[in-house]
Structure formats: structure tokens, C-alpha cells
Amino acid sequence: MGNLVIGSRGSELALWQANHIKERLKKECSIESEIQIVKTKGDKILDTPLNKIGGKGLFTKELEELLLKGEIDLAVHSLKDVPVVFEKGLDLACITKRADVRDTFLSVKFPDLMSLPKGAKVGTTSLRRSMQLKLKRQDLDTESLRGNVQTRLKKLECGEFDAIILAEAGLCRLEIQGAKYRKAFSVEEMIPSMGQGALGVEMLKSHKHFATLQKLNDEESAFCCHLERAFVKGLNGGCQIPIGVHASLMGDRVKIRAVLGLPNGKEVIAKERQGDKTKAFDLVQELLEAFLQSGAKEILEKAQLF
């Protein structure tokens, strides 16, 4: 029997993630594997903001097509990029232990967000981040920032931006200091994207090793990520819309906090629920209903126009 084939995007971060799974497959499952690089739509179109490209699965669709054809055995994704609805026959075989979930402020000249001058230019790929930045500083000029981690940092260092916002997990995985000034936002200051900090391994449910990969699953991370994904799914949301949601466990209790709004920060809903872990999905439903009653659907429809 040949090696399993892991499908991965070609960026340094994506390959770190694929190699991480490759090493764990060998160590924990005694399975040999090799990596096949796949270019996705999101990798090919670099001069357009992600929300303007259109379609779901900008960083996953091509990998899913190869899974369905049997040309690769598994695909390793940043879980935050994985759509909440799968192609028929596909599912997550495991969700790995979460790394740091926070978003991080980086700048060459300014130590933190509040020290930026009026009208400062802040780069981010994410409407979710833009929305939450605008909530704090309506005067900021938030602009699309595309490319891999190193490309984004070069744009900062060259003076194209006064500051940029990146995921802390990616910086840690690549062991990058990033810039002279680096400060992570707390989860309360900036609610992360669903699944942020975790890796998701996608496979055909019928694959003979699908169940085997449960050995790589982290129960607590998976539980929290599934709560977050259920919330986004309940809003018919995708990866490129301004929704932040974060679930955390505190012993036998769970807290779920969420935010959604227009990218300009003008109309925003933010709420949280907490309760017994055994009623976690009921809490998600309760939170969803509270958002819907506050006009979430209407705000998300308006957000599509940005």
C-alpha cells in the first residue's frame, strides 16, 4: 500500500500545517504520507479583496474536488477557512488542539491600536477584523491586505501600511517576531473567527482511515469549534463575512460570545451566553435567536454590498 497523500496549499504556513499532520500521522497512527501542493482560487487571485472574489471555499474548493476524485486522501486546512456545509461525502476527520486564537496588531512605528494617528492605514484580509477595528477607531482607514504572512509583513515594513492585523497562531507556528511592535488583542477586544487557531483535516467519510484520524482529534478544541461553526451555519454565514464567534470551556461551563456587523462598524450586534456544558448547543440556538431578533440577517445582507 502506498503512502497517503495530503493535499495542501503552497504557502509556508500551509506547508507547516501539512507537515505537522504528516509527522503526527507517522508518530500517532503509524501512517506514512506525502504532501501534494494544490493552488486554490484564493491563492491565484491576489489583487482582489476576498469578499469581492465571490463563492464559498476560496481556499478549500480545489482540495475538496481532489478528495472527491480520490487523487488525495486528506486535506489540511486552517479551520477558519473551512465552509460550514460540506460537499456530499466529505467531512472533518479531526480538529487539532487549538493554538492561540487571538488576532495580533503589528506595526513598525506605533506600539498599539490607540497610538495610531487619525486616518492611519491598517491592512487586514478580514471584514470581521475591519468591523471590530472600526468599532474602536472609526477614523482608521482599513484596507485589504492579501498574500502570505511574509508578503504582508514586507508591505508593512515598506511603509504601505501603518499597521496590519494577523492571526497570532500563524506567527507562532512560523516563529516570526513580525515587527518592532506586536500586541495581541484579547478575545474580549477582538472576537476571533470560527475555528481560528485550529487545523481541520477533511476526508471522504468512506475512507478507510477516516476513523483512524480521531487519534489526532482534540476533544475540547473540537467541541468549541463545532459550537462556533453551528452559530455561523445558523446565520447562513461563510468565511468571508463579518462574523466573529468564540466558545470557551471553564470546567463544566461554556461561554459563547459573538459579534457581527457592517465592515464600517456602523451597525453591530454583540452578545454572549454562558451555561452548563451539557446544554451548549441549546445556548448556541438561544444566541442565534437573540441575534436574529436584533436584525442579524438584515445586517449581513447589507454587508454583502461592501
Curated annotation (Swiss-Prot):
Gene3D superfamilies from the UniProt entry: Periplasmic binding protein-like II, Porphobilinogen deaminase, C-terminal domain
Cofactor: dipyrromethane
Matching PROSITE patterns: PORPHOBILINOGEN_DEAM
GO-annotated molecular function: hydroxymethylbilane synthase activity
An annotated GO BP: protoporphyrinogen IX biosynthetic process
Cofactor note: Binds 1 dipyrromethane group covalently.
PANTHER family: PORPHOBILINOGEN DEAMINASE
Family of the protein in this entry: Belongs to the HMBS family.
Role of this protein: Tetrapolymerization of the monopyrrole PBG into the hydroxymethylbilane pre-uroporphyrinogen in several discrete steps.
The protein's name: Porphobilinogen deaminase
